């Protein structure tokens, strides 16, 4: 595998797709509150009957996307094996993260205090469908052996 690794490297996370019950409510949260751009809003490739809304950078760069498939009839999910616990957006500094925390709380969004793992700092909120959303500082980060020194 070592010789093939240069040819077969994973370069990062491309996108995360979740399910939402109400696409308009999801747009209000991620575009209007969080400031993400809608980079696509239309039928899903997997299910032409389902609306698929993509949020991210204006140019749609891979690694900057989160999308939601609109399935209003599905029941609410539960956290468990085979489900996703949360997804995280990155900010550069603790000051930027604190500004997000203050802004979100000012908008009536329940937001945790800062949690410092030693590798990065995190705050957590829930979107209208209950997805856990983390806003994390980029550093100091992890190395192969654990948190960076």
Kindly label every feature range from the protein language model.
Residues 1-8, 13-21, 53, 57, 75-149, ...:
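Vicinal oxygen chelate
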Residues 2-5, 73-78:
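Short beta-strand/turn micro-motifs at beta-sheet edges
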Residues 19-63:
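Core segments of cupin and vicinal oxygen chelate
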Residues 29, 79, 85, 136, ...:
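Long, contiguous binding/interaction regions
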Residues 41-44, 73-74, 115-118, 122:
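Short, solvent-exposed loop/turn elements at beta->coil junctions and helix N-caps
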Residues 65-68:
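Conserved oxyanion/phosphate-binding beta-strand-loop segments in alpha/beta enzyme cores
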